Each structure stands twice: as structure tokens, then as C-alpha cells.
Amino acid sequence: MSRKIIITEKQLKKIISEITNKEITEKANEADKTPTEAQKKMGNYKMGHVNINGFNITIENPKGSYRKGVDKNGKEWKTKMMHHYGYFTKTLGHDGDHIDVFIGTYLKYDKIFVVDQVNENGDFDESKVMLGFKDIKSAKEAYLSNFSSDWKGFKEITSVSIPFFKKWLYDKKKQRKPFYEYVDVKKENDSH
């Protein structure tokens, strides 16, 4: 005699999240933590690849690694990554690169948070996504923790539903202006 085991949606989310957090870290740790500048420019180094709740993500910098580079003035910079960092595959952001994502551990989310980042002149630079964070406050704190204390690139953070975010993520026309400026984002947030 066979028995049916019934689990609730809440229990399933917990099981999936626990498995996923472990798998994400394992995949993230496959990434080369010290690629050369040439390798970074060409994207020619080992990276981690994960699928988180339907999003295909490449992890460039695992939590605890250092992200470094050279700014426009030739000054070297380096920052320790407090969260896994990578990008959504098959996307194109305002800056001409893939849309970047920081990955938290709270994967039982129903919201995604999008940060609009500005350059030194205060002009829109790009949007960065905060995936797996409990609320807007923790998402903002997580974003800022991955930059130096004198970072001035944070402009705005917006909370949005997953279905709406998916629609925006794969519409290449949408990344031309800050996320928070979209009328449909404002309408969605006003309805909550």
C-alpha cells in the first residue's frame, strides 16, 4: 500500500531554499577568484552557473572574494564581496553589459529589489538587482555593503513583484532609463 505525502507550499519553499542556498554556494565557489584583467574583459575565466527560481545567473564573484579594477582615472580599486555577485544571462543593461545581480540567502521571497546606480556626474549608470533579500531595507544595506564607504553611486531602490520583474528583465528597451521611472513600476507599487 502506498501513501501520499502532502506538503504545503510553505514547506516546499523551505526545502527548495535550503537546497538552493547550498547549491548556489557550491556553484559560486567554482568561479575563478583571481582572473586577470584581460580575462575579465573577455569574460574568459571559470564562473559559476545557477538557476534560481527560473533565473539563469552566472556568478562572477563569490561571496568573500575581491572584485577589483581600474577606474577612468587609472586608479586601482578593490572591494570584498559580501554577497555572491554576477549577472542574468541573455540580458543587456543600460551600460552595455549584462544586468548585474547580488544574491542573498533569503530565497523565500516574493519581491525583487532593483537599485538604480548613478555615475560621478549623477547621471543614470545602470540598474543592479538584489535577489534573495527579505525586504527593501536589507536589500539596500546589502547593496551598500559591497562598496567602499565613500561610494556615491546609490540613487534609488525599488521593490517589485517577480512576474513584473521578469517582464522588465527580458525587454531590452526597458533598460534605457532608471527602473524607478517606469510608469508601470509606479502603478504596481502604488497598488500594494
Which residue stretches match the model-derived regions?
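Protein-protein interaction and targeting regions used for scaffolding, dimerization, and localization
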Residues: 1-26
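Hydrophobic N-terminal alpha-helices or hydrophobic patches in metabolic proteins across all domains
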Residues: 23-192
